[in-house]
Design a protein with these regions (language model features):
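Ordered, amphipathic secondary-structure segments that act as subunit-interaction surfaces
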Residues: 63-110
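Short hydrophobic beta-strand that contains or immediately precedes a catalytic carboxylate
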Residues: 8-10, 110
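Feature 3881 marks metal-assisted phosphotransfer/nuclease machinery
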Residues: 1-6, 17-34, 38-51, 56-61, ...
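Metabolite-binding pocket within alpha/beta catalytic cores that recognizes anionic/polar moieties
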Residues: 12-15
Length: 189
């Protein structure tokens, strides 16, 4: 995992991330995070709207106007996804983010399980990188952008879960902790 220039975020990611105490680390990992207009329309939480507005004003977030071709491809992706029984459903905002991730090389930020599986199950999207908040946190730690207490490395994940009420799968936390513990061991050498 390395630093990236651009990401595109969907609704579920932004709603959770807006509640996180270290949310500004997002803008240390990425130069710009794009937000499709379709995603903004879904946000109802006042806290999230205020945070997004401030970030747009500071040029940390940038509005992304989706082309009609991207909308059409996103609709096709939804149709394809509905034909794959093992793929949890995705809706238009997630599909738009995946389409833009594919065409522009942006990392897709989401908590949607269906969006996480698309690169594994649909070959056209196999090169799309999809991160949950968990991968973002690990990336921030590995690049020294988020301080980790190596005596309690799991604390960064539990802080996020406490702040957002979003629970990471235990298998995913275990894998993330292995990476962070490896980072801590290297730091001590």
């Amino acid at each position: 995992m390395s630093l990236r220039e651009y990401a595109i975020a969907d609704t579920c990611f932004l709603i959770d991330w807006a509640r996180y105490r270290h949310r500004d680390v997002l803008f240390k990992v990425f130069k710009t995070v794009f937000v499709p207009e379709e995603v903004l329309r879904e946000v109802k939480s006042e806290e999230t709207i205020v945070w997004i507005s401030r970030c747009l004003a500071r040029d940390y977030l940038s509005l992304y106007t989706v082309s009609r071709y991207e909308i059409e491809e996103a609709r096709e992706l939804i149709e394809i996804s509905r034909r794959i029984p093992q793929l949890p459903s995705i809706d238009l905002p997630e599909a738009i983010c995946l389409v833009i991730g594919r065409s522009r090389g942006y990392i897709v930020l989401t908590e949607n399980r269906g969006a996480l599986y698309v690169p594994r199950l649909i070959s056209r999207y196999s090169r799309v990188i999809v991160w949950r908040a968990l991968e973002l946190l690990v990336n921030a730690v590995l690049n020294n952008l988020l301080h980790v207490d190596c005596n309690e490395p799991e604390k960064i994940f539990y802080e996020y879960m406490d702040d957002t009420q979003h629970i990471f799968p235990s298998k995913a936390i275990k894998k993330a902790l292995e990476l962070v513990n490896g980072f801590c061991r290297e730091k001590m050498l």
